[in-house]
Amino acid sequence: MPKVSIITPCYKAERFIARTLESVRAQTLTDWEHVVVDDGSPDDSAQVVQGYAARDPRVRLLRQPNGGMENARNSGFAACSAGSEFLLFLDADDCLEPEALATLAGYLEARPAVGLAYCARIWIDADDRPMEDANRQPLPRFAPAWRGARVLPDSEPETPLAALVAFHLAIPSSCLIRRSVYAQTDGWDERLRRKGFEDLDMVMRCALLAPVHYVPTVLLRYRRHGGNASHVTDLAGDRVPFARKWNRSEGLSRDQVRRVRRAFDFDRFLAAHLQFRAARERVSRRDLRKGLFFWAQGVRKTLKFLLALARREGAS
């Protein structure tokens, strides 16, 4: 049985799917299976995958009518080998670094209590070029603290639910999930199809079941391009069904309800805190400019006074 089951929903990915498949085949950990679900693609995505499946028995193609990414992920999981230990839901346009599976699987094997490990990522464009603006600074992991919020250092890998909610830190392609933890969820919520919050929804459900850890090694190349699903959704408007679902707290214990509410409270606090800090920095920069202006004026007036004084003394 494979150690890792990789599930890839594929829709209109003809341009990128070969690069994704090649990144999986380049893994130093070779004990994997890759189930690619063609979700009714109108292009030649399925033909590309079929070509790889013919050459590598670890790659399998599953075809179905278009049902959305969440439905395709659920179908892919159902088609996986029952004995795999870990799951990775890899998008059809993202690429793994060669050590990704070995690093994340090794991390979880060494820490049986951890349910999900997610890695650092770099952003690439449609032509595989790193996006310098996006990669300039990694997303901070903000966590609640007695003074409001603090940034978790890399030496503290455990990422609390509040931090995961605040910045949507863990995306599917970066997450290796322990299968026994995922099996306790209901799978991907198809009611949130194309709402922009289905990824966070799954991460939250895993985080309520077991600790989530951050591995600060870049193991994923996360692609941004005009066809990304996240680019064509209105995240502000689509938050409503996601929030409504979690406000109902169906099937959650009292402790889980408390953790979820604290996470959403922290999310709102952090948004206000960061806006206030940004406004304060703008004011500080403005005051600095004013201060430099008046300082320069003062220096100029002092020099003029000293020059005039020297002239008077020279004349006398």
PLM segments and residue spans:
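Short loop->beta transition adjacent to catalytic acidic/histidine clusters or analogous donor-positioning motifs
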Residues: 2-4, 25-36, 44, 57-60
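A conserved hydrophobic helix/loop-capping motif in glycosyltransferases and polysaccharide synthases
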Residues: 3-16, 20, 27, 37
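A conserved acidic beta->alpha catalytic loop
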Residues: 23, 30, 38-47, 91, ...
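Glycine-rich, basic loop-to-helix element that forms the pyrophosphate-binding segment
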Residues: 64-82
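Short aromatic/hydrophobic "clamp" motif used to bind/position activated sugar donors
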Residues: 87
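Conserved donor NDP-sugar-binding/catalytic core segment of glycosyltransferases
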Residues: 99-143
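Catalytic core of nucleotide-sugar-dependent glycosyltransferases
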Residues: 141-143, 210, 218-226, 231-258, ...
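Conserved nucleotide-sugar donor-binding catalytic segment
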Residues: 143-235, 239
